[in-house]
Amino acid sequence: TEGREVSTTMVFVRILAKLLKDKEIGKLVVPIVPDEARTFGMEALFRQVGIYSHAGQLYDPVDKDSLLYYKEAKDGQILEEGINEAGSMSSFIAAGTAYNTHGINMIPFFIYYSMFGMQRVGDLVWAAGDIGAKGFMLGGTAGRTTLNGEGLQHQDGHSHLLAYPVPNLVTYDPAFAYELAVIIRDGIKRMYEDQEHIFYYITLMNENYAMPEMPKGAEKGILKGMYKFHASDKKSLKLKAQLFGSGTILNEVIKAAKILEDDYRVACDVWSVTSYKEIRRDALEAERFNLLNPTAKQKESYIEKMLAKEDGVFVASSD
């Protein structure tokens, strides 16, 4: 972002706006919001594509005089469901299974307060997995450190744990804009080009910070679940630490690395961990192959390959 501070939620809304404008797939994108469209900065989409209403706009919204007013239309594209996560998840399932039911590859993006997803409609998430729904669930305002103003009810630090058991749910906790872009692009490829029966859960933050450029060769690691964001250049230091960070906490990990190097003479490599679930999934697959094929060449998991030559203390932090 060239020094400009934005949140990953803002980045997602920009990605969504561009997808909606795409001449090929724009008409297939289904934005679904239970209640918090303005909280997520999505009001620009009201004017761009409108909010779907089978009857059209039957009243004058209170913000009619503003540029980005609450615009309902018969041809609107946003599903604004009110405070109704269960109904929104049902819309997600309907759109996410349209490829099977109607032969149309709809691409739903269901964004909501992350505390009110897995914790509130977990059964429907399992149903989506069972029925083969595709699409993206976005847990907005995730984490426990950047939404203190709204109280403990919104401080979600555990939705990823609830997402772990769903086998075909691919989960990510990205820190930077380029990570989010890579994940969404690959998700569209896997679900709609490769026809994999998976769906996605991605947490988004509301903390604003400058987004760096993508390090060369990082794309594979982003999708696999981890990559080295910064390698220490303090080769002369005897002590070493490997610091893992996810989501917005990665910024604090980067700061911690500098403090450790400058004040305590501990060389620190910083790793961005985008998905512990994907790392674990890969490790379990390697372990299973090795167990069932004892005479074949044994597979090495991604995390084993990445950390084989790394030493020092390993510290993992997330929000």
Predicted regions and their residues:
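Short beta-strand segments
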Residues: 33, 111, 138-141, 201-205, ...
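Ferredoxin-type iron-sulfur electron-transfer modules in oxidoreductases and energy-metabolism complexes
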Residues: 176
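Flexible inter-domain linker/hinge segments
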Residues: 1-26, 212-221
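Short coil/turn connectors at secondary-structure junctions
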Residues: 25-29, 73-76, 102-108, 131-136, ...
